[in-house]
């Protein structure tokens, strides 16, 4: 069992006294290596014995090929053995028999040809290659072997004939390139041009034309280079279509003209390519054009190139999807940066004409920003206030307010009117918004506007309408109360808070209660604060409320302390014993309430807060008293509705544990009494149980 668990552990990890080197390990491995078995050398005494051996081997090979004719290795081994015996005629016979079985096997043809070449039978090898390429004209390795043999023999006309035969089968580009390299090696450039013409007719791809153009740059004139490029563009467009024209042709053509210092020709080529190629296929062309203008153009030309490029990009994108508002944003910013007012206005008008197809708010969220940006641009850049106001009105009339609205549009329109000094129009705009489609944000902005103008009566009216519209919004009640408190109307503030806490539905009622309690505490109304805490506990008997209540009692100064306090006094006084006693009563009430309702987790959090309080303000006895009430954790399991079990943490309090023990003692006494009544022999047990219970 120990060995099956893994390799043995090394207990002593100290270095060994004798170290083993890598050289020693390799030497031992070589010394211990077993010697491979070697076939003993056969020696033949005379020719008759050799013939007998050859006959026996031939019979074995014949048996092999007869049993499995389709296995190529048998034929190759047979032929190779005959070659080793210098029996070339027999070897040819074996190869020919193998070709009858495998006439399309490239490896067999190549081995046959190599055998003839090795034995200097060149004519036979040439005939074999002729047969091979006739039989398998699509196998490039046979053609290359044939061409290699012909060129090594110095038969260049024969090599051309082989190439011509091969080119009739329209091979791949490498074959054409090999033919061209042959003519270049022997200085036949006119023949190479003719090959290029046939090459581009068979493979009219851009890279083929680029190879031809590069050839003409090396061995031709500028006119022939231009002719090649022009023919390439025209031929590719006619045979493969306009989309097949590659940007690399324009780039190479323009760079060639730039090298000749024909900058106007190069610029015309770049522009022609950009105008006729789609943007997705002219990215690199545009990058080269930009570089060209930076090198040989002026600043305006460079900026125009960049703007044109991006403008083409955005035009294609909006053509594909006119409802892509993010593209319209970028398009408008581009025209703004260009400084052309008419172009910018045209883009904005085209953009806002793309009304969302449905009346769903999610489709309108990006669309309305087009109006906002358009109006701001008209206001700031062109100073056309009338057009900006018209844009806002168009947007508001276009939005289906019965289904949804956008507060930001109403607020932007109001701020616009304020900037123009039209305060009445701004109020009418916000009032119209509240009347048509009230929203919390509109109320908030309207109230903020009136507060800045110190129109507090208008603020009160707006707050009244706001709480009528949405009485569950706690922040509205709190802001209203803060306004009244700032105006030093405490009774109105209390009335607002009372209305708020009496609402049946609030989104965050605890926030309102806290604001109300903080208000009374800051005003020094401690009895009112206590009453609020008691009312809150009736609604929400939560540990946080009890803890906050206790903290409040600690922070309340006594009457004597209130009289002694002055505004200049900054020293912090210790907490009085009366405040500590009040806080302890709160903790005791809370603990009793949670104990009766068996709220264990809440009870633990309360005890932790109580213990922290005693550590800060209590004595050692008080701390020990609370620590004795702290529970211990235990893990239990409970059954779920789907008949599975889950593990949870439960708390066992010392008081509850003692009650359980007392109940167990009582049950033991009852059980003993039952046994005594049944058999009469349990008196001793009853006495022992009674003693245990009394103890």
Swiss-Prot record:
Principal localisation: nucleus
GO biological process: mRNA splicing, via spliceosome; spliceosomal complex assembly
A GO term from the CC aspect: U2-type catalytic step 2 spliceosome
A Pfam family the protein falls into: HAT_Syf1_CNRKL1_N
InterPro entries: HAT, HAT_Syf1-like_N, HAT_Syf1_CNRKL1_C, Syf1-like, TPR-like_helical_dom_sf, TPR_rpt
Keywords: mRNA processing, mRNA splicing, Nucleus, Repeat, Spliceosome
Top-level taxon: Eukaryota
Compartments reported by the entry: Nucleus
First and last residues of every HAT repeat: 52-84, 86-118, 120-152, 154-185, 187-218, 220-259, 261-295, 305-337, 339-373, 383-419, 421-452, 454-486, 488-522, 524-555, 578-616, 621-654
SMART domains in the record: HAT
Record flagged with keyword Repeat: yes
Family: Belongs to the crooked-neck family.
Function: Involved in pre-mRNA splicing and cell cycle progression. Required for the spliceosome assembly and initiation of the DNA replication.
Subunit comment: Associated with the spliceosome.
The protein's name: Pre-mRNA-splicing factor clf-1
Species: Neurospora crassa (strain ATCC 24698 / 74-OR23-1A / CBS 708.71 / DSM 1257 / FGSC 987)
Gene: clf-1
């Amino acid at each position: 069992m120990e060995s099956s668990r893994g390799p043995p552990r090394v207990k002593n990890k100290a270095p060994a006294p004798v170290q083993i080197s890598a050289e020693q390990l390799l030497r031992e491995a070589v010394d211990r290596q077993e010697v491979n078995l070697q076939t003993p050398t056969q020696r033949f005494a005379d020719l008759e014995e050799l013939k007998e051996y050859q006959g026996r081997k031939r019979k074995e090979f014949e048996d092999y090929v007869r049993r499995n004719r389709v296995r190529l290795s048998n034929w190759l081994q047979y032929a190779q053995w005959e070659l080793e015996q210098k029996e070339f005629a027999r070897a040819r016979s074996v190869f020919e028999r193998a070709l009858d079985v495998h006439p399309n096997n490239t490896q067999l043809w190549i081995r046959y040809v190599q055998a003839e070449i090795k034995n200097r039978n060149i004519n036979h090898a040439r005939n074999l290659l002729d047969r091979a390429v006739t039989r398998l004209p699509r196998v490039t390795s046979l053609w290359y072997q044939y061409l290699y043999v012909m060129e090594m023999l110095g038969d260049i006309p024969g090599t051309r004939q082989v190439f011509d035969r091969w080119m009739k089968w329209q091979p791949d580009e490498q074959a054409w390139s090999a033919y061209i390299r042959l003519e270049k090696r022997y200085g036949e450039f006119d023949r190479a041009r003719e090959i290029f013409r046939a090459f581009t007719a068979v493979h009219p791809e851009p890279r083929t034309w680029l190879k031809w153009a590069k050839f003409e740059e090396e061995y031709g004139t500028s006119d022939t280079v231009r002719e090649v490029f022009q023919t390439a563009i025209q031929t590719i467009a006619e045979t493969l279509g306009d989309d097949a024209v590659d940007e690399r042709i324009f780039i190479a053509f323009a760079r060639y003209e730039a090298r000749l210092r024909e900058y106007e020709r190069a610029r015309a080529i770049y522009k022609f390519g950009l105008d006729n190629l789609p943007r997705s296929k002219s990215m690199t062309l545009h990058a080269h054009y930009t570089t060209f203008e930076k090198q040989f153009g002026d600043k305006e030309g460079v900026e125009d190139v960049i703007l044109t490029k991006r403008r083409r990009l955005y035009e294609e994108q909006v053509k594909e999807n006119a409802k892509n508002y993010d593209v319209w944003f970028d398009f408008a910013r581009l025209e703004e940066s260009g400084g052309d007012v008419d172009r910018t206005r045209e883009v904005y008008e085209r953009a806002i004409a793309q009304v969302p197809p449905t009346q769903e708010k999610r489709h309108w969220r990006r669309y309305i920003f087009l109006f906002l940006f358009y109006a701001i641009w008209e206001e700031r850049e062109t100073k056309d206030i009338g057009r900006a106001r018209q844009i806002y009105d168009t947007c508001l009339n276009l939005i289906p307010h019965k289904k949804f609205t956008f507060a930001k549009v109403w607020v932007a329109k109001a701020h616009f009117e304020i900037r123009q000094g039209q305060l009445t129009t701004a109020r009418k705009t916000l009032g119209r918004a509240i009347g048509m489609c009230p929203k919390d944000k509109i109320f908030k902005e309207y109230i903020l506007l009136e507060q800045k103008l110190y129109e507090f009566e208008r603020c009160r009216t707006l707050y009244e309408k706001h709480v009528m519209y949405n009485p569950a919004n706690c922040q509205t009640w709190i802001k209203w109360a803060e306004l009244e408190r700032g105006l030093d109307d405490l009774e109105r503030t209390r009335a607002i808070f009372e209305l708020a806490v009496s609402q049946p539905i609030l989104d965050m009622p605890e926030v309102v209660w806290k604001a109300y309690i903080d208000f009374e505490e800051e005003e020094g109304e401690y009895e009112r604060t206590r009453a609020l805490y008691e009312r809150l506990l009736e609604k929400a008997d939560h540990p946080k409320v009890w803890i906050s209540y206790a903290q409040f009692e600690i922070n309340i100064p006594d009457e004597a302390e209130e009289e002694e306090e002055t505004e200049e006094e900054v020293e912090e006084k210790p907490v009085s014993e009366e405040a500590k006693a009040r806080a302890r009563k709160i903790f005791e009430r809370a603990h009793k309430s949670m104990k009766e309702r068996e709220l264990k987790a809440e009870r633990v959090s309360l005890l932790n807060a109580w213990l922290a309080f005693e550590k800060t303000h209590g004595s050692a006895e008080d701390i020990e008293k609370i620590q004795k009430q702290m529970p211990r954790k235990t893990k239990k399991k409970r059954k779920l509705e789907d008949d599975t079990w889950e593990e949870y943490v439960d708390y066992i309090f010392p008081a509850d544990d003692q009650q359980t023990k007392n109940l167990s003692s009582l049950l033991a006494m009852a059980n003993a009494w039952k046994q005594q009544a049944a058999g009469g022999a349990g008196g001793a047990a009853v006495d022992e149980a009674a003693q245990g219970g009394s103890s």
